[in-house]
Amino acid sequence: MLSVACSIGDCPITNAYLHILKSKIRNHADSGFFLAGLSASLQLEIQEGSLEHIPHRVVSKGLHLALDWSLQYLEDPRCPVRVAVNWSSAASISAVIRGIISSKSITGLDEETTEAVVIPLIIQAFVSVFGYVVEHPSESVPVQLLFAPGQASIAKSEVWKQTVLLDLPWPCRGRPQGVKRSALSPPICNVRVALFNITIEPLAEFEEAETSSNTRIYHADSTDAFRLKALRQVGDRLDRLGATAVLSQKIVPKYLQTYLATKGIFTLDRLSAAYIRNVQMLSGATILSDWRIDDSIVSSSLGALSLITTQTLGNKQFIRLHREGTVVDSENAHPVTTIAITAPDRFAFDELNHVVTTSVKMLASLIDNPDVVAGAGCVEIHLAALLRDRAKQLRNPGPISNGTVPRGTQTDNKAARTLRQMSQTITTFANCLEDMAGRLCGSHASATDREVMIEQIRHANNESLLATTTLPCQNGLSERKSYDLYGWDPRKRSTMQVLSYTIQSDEEKIASEARILDTLQSKKDALTLVIESVSSLARIASVVRVS
């Protein structure tokens, strides 16, 4: 990809590129395609394009200068492509989700399904846990996704609030043979939950002691008697505490399960760590890590659920755990929402799972940093215009209002050449940014088609582009009272309005319409990671000769 004479196996630069890119994408939220495409384009320019004969240190310096200018532009409150999300506006929230979904064509979602099903599902789920996310910004969002097979369309998907769905069969232990209905048959109501993350095995300590001392005491009869008595004591203590259900991440011995069943206590073991966390949050139970259940364990350590029952979704049965808001007043209990996604197959679910999970995480990130930028290629076109304008000033050095180029620069031949090379580097970066916007035309579009498309976006954004190049001036944005911003609609193959806002007297921007929005932090992170990746490769290329 990056070298004509080398395959991936023997090209050190290509191998380094793939390694760096993989590590960066893992740490990035949702601009993986932007990161991969832009960094690849820049690397091609450095290896065999317009930057091939420019020293790598100058290229790196030029790219970092371009990054600084880009970040300064995006971080300026007067930036014409930037607004803050209005949480009372469904249109703004929908635009952020739409910006994520529109970049994931592999999901195969059509516009009607996106608007009528997917976006409402995500908003409904996020709103249901909004209070928790606000209070616990560093915690993961308690929204669980579940594959409900047997449906050809996502339209049957559902949001289950205050609910955890377990992809497990209903246990039958403890039900007398021939009896169809018992106290442990679903539904089980008003449940008090004991939650364990250990194997309940009284002999474990003795076995560990014997192993560590390299001795083995053969007393099968006495140890068996001790074990069964200890397990019955566990059951008795759980019963006295008022537990009506025992859920465990590890194994609950079959003998104990049967003993608990005689007391009307439901048992479910070998739950995944994710299931245990969700049950703990939903019920408010304290996770128990000692099978003895001594006097320090009180009834308040138990969680509370309204219902444990079965639920059929699609053609599959799940175990459903539900809690009404009034069941328990515990600071440990929190809302948990499950989205049951109907999809024709696991592959389709995985793609939808990624879209929904990313959307929920993005919305959560906007609580602390609500700034977003116009999407669908709009911000790339504006950044390209900004960088070309700055590159011209760099080629003809003079004082720039933000002080990036020092006054009194000695423009001797060497310095002038370096400035020209840096200017060329920044211009190339601008071209690559525009090319990323041009890719919205589709993979089969010609270079001419992309140029025409980019020119159409430029023309539609004429006023905001003018503000972009004059932004360092004090009155760069305040002279206008409103802006309409445009991106590219791949389906209609024409420009579309992605954001419209008015500027209040206090300089606050109020969005009146929003179609496609990207989070500001995500865009800044992607730009930073691109420059870091390409600069790292430039340093490698400066000491590695590829034949």
Q: What are these model-predicted stretches?
A:
Residues 268-341, 345, 349:
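Conserved phosphate-handling catalytic cores of large alpha/beta enzymes
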Residues 39-41, 54, 61-65, 198-201, ...:
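Short, ordered loop/turn segments at secondary-structure junctions
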Residues 192-270:
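Extracellular/luminal Protease-associated
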Residues 1-24, 251, 255, 262-266, ...:
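Generic N-terminal targeting/processing segments that precede catalytic cores or assembly contacts
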Residues 8-9, 338-340, 345-547:
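Extended, low-charge hydrophobic alpha-helical regions
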Residues 17, 21-28, 42-54, 63-82, ...:
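Structural signal for hydrophobic packing residues in well-ordered secondary-structure cores
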Residues 4-8, 22-186, 190-195, 240-242, ...:
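Non-catalytic interaction/clamp surfaces of large macromolecular machines
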